[in-house]
Amino acid sequence: MRHRLRHDRHLAFAYRHAAADILAIHPNSAALFYRKIRTVINYHLALAADEVFEGPVELDESYFGGRRKGRRGRGAAGKVVVFGILKRNGRVYTVVVDNAKSETLLPVIKKKIMPDSIVYTDSLSSYDKLDTSGFIHYRINHSKEFVDRQNHINGIENFWNQAKRFLRKYNGIDRKSFPLFLKECEFRFNFGTPSQQLKILRDWCGI
């Protein structure tokens, strides 16, 4: 484990210095540069946050910051709880929440999803109230095999996997900065190829 931590720190150090070499700036300046880019991303995604999803939508919660302990829905000591909403064949929306209880998630769901939309969730009890909240609610059970190919949350789970794989290289992100990194993951998932993302960033930054 100690060897793995040293390896991860070396990777993060290498990433920062490689970026600094490309930009011909000091490594600390490279870190500041990337923070400014993430701030721009966060600003523009916040402007679009009022977009309402409709049609088939997948909902799920995930825990960041290492191995989760404790019961789902009650938060997890030392972990960051993130709630995600994915419109199938569309974009993902994420938000950091205090916990995954129904009273925390339901207001986000009602604000972000059009009434009468089809929503897919796992069997977490926090989603029980969706049955009486104006949505067409389907639950999936990972322990069973379903014939209905539509009854899944593979899309949002794919996003979680991509986000965690991307964030792992930083070997720990402080809670204050985490939302900016999360929105970078959301941006990368939603906005096409790297070349398309670069074009969008240039437009947003006015360069």
Q: Where are these predicted regions, by residue range?
A:
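Residue-level recognition of single "structural anchor" positions
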Residues: 1-207
